[in-house]
């Protein structure tokens, strides 16, 4: 026997007998053999015990590599399965996965595993880690595994996709499959944490049983684990779902409709302020705001192409019984096209800018729903401009300037530009007109080049009817998210027969520019909630000033007078008339992250003044009511956090 192993640098090592991955690593360098945790053999992850006995390409994986962390986390998931099965013999195991976020294991138990049981599972894992229990890598016939798991439908489902010979891992009597590479023993899984338990449908289908998904993470170094747990705690504090509950901004009740948020008065106030701001900005920029129905005849979506390309994301149509089929709109563009078509248009009117805070409905699977970020009913800050061909670049620059102005007011600074094209290898899901795609993509690129802006290009991210500029922001939780979009569309004007009368008296086809400045109200307010951590700047805060009388009987009437003065000038203020201790009320105001807390006692009442405490500070300053009104007025008008 003789064979060669090709290494990443192109060099080769020759062998005359079979070697394990660990032996291969040691033959390259003794230190590499000690650091190795696995290898990529012909691009596939393999464990240290894997035997190499033929010509292959090999890359050794160490604990310094990302793939090494995947191997560690997969091993932690395997160990969690083993100890959970020991602790709960009746337990059935489903999917498992390890990635850059950590690992998870799906479990099925009649008496569901609760988060309070995680410490006991951790202790069982730590005991196995301390003992350095051996993890055996071997293979078994698929038929053997089917016999072992004959009473476990979950495992039988997973075995359907396996070959006749299946790689398996054993820890004592425990056996499982579906792992690429694991460590040879439990000793290195020292720095791990079980994080949470959540529901997950088997194979991701809502018609299947709901399992309990246990999440965890693991690192080679304790410092890395500590840093990750600190980051996760920060994320939890910033999670808009948590803040929304604590500040009473919104709620979602699956019993009355998953993905359908209810806006409480405070959340509705924030949304209303944002909506008014957006409308004022757009009107000042030449847009005409409209209202259009949320229902539309299905034929409109057949004409637009949504029915063919977007139907899976739409709710089923409503049969009105007289041949009419109505559809909840998933997008606003066909509605704005009807506004354009309602009159004969002249070149003198162009560009025609139409905008709407348009309510839409999209069918999202229940497993994808999340707070305000993924919902089934949403209100989009939508706009469409109809232009002549020679107006595209100027209008594109104008829209981009409007977006940048809005970003400045909200102090959005962490973003980049992405030009999103169709996938040339998978054109079936896009409007079939190669010339249109080439023209619109080159025009979009030229418009960005004219402005001297840096951008990345992404194939496969375009809408089915045209390429677009996506402005990608980084959320407070570290996720990449599309905030704004500008899109060139030659298709819909063609499909709906849109025209304008040109200077020559002939009919011409306009180009349609789709644009969204801040996306949906739901997602944007989720973004703001997390960025501000619930401590909204004064202009956005649902309650701008909390007024607390020291003694209700003595100072309650004066507190109402102060609130009335503030309300008269357009400021949002509340009086805390509850029969609670003063210190409790002040702490509550801070907990609710109200920008200004005003405490009113004898001194303030006699001087027609207020005692002011800014959120996040201990300092209390007495001043006249007029001076405070001037202060809060300047604060509200400053908009940006930087100002």
Swiss-Prot record:
Pfam families: HGTP_anticodon, TGS, tRNA-synt_2b, tRNA_SAD. Residues 1-62 form the TGS domain. GO terms for biological process: threonyl-tRNA aminoacylation. It comes from the Bacteria. Keywords: Aminoacyl-tRNA synthetase, ATP-binding, Cytoplasm, Ligase, Metal-binding, Nucleotide-binding, Protein biosynthesis, RNA-binding, tRNA-binding, Zinc. Zn(2+) binds at residues 333, 384, 514. The keyword Zinc applies. One of its GO terms (molecular function) is catalytic activity, acting on a protein. Its EC number is 6.1.1.3. Its cofactor is Zn(2+). CDD domains: TGS_ThrRS (cd01667), ThrRS_anticodon (cd00860), ThrRS_core (cd00771). Residues 239-537 are annotated as: Catalytic. SMART domains: tRNA_SAD (SM00863). Binds 1 zinc ion per subunit. One of its GO terms (cellular component) is cytoplasm. It is an enzyme of class 6 (ligase). Catalyzes the attachment of threonine to tRNA(Thr) in a two-step reaction: L-threonine is first activated by ATP to form Thr-AMP and then transferred to the acceptor end of tRNA(Thr). Also edits incorrectly charged L-seryl-tRNA(Thr). Belongs to the class-II aminoacyl-tRNA synthetase family. This is Threonine--tRNA ligase. It comes from Lactobacillus johnsonii (strain CNCM I-12250 / La1 / NCC 533).
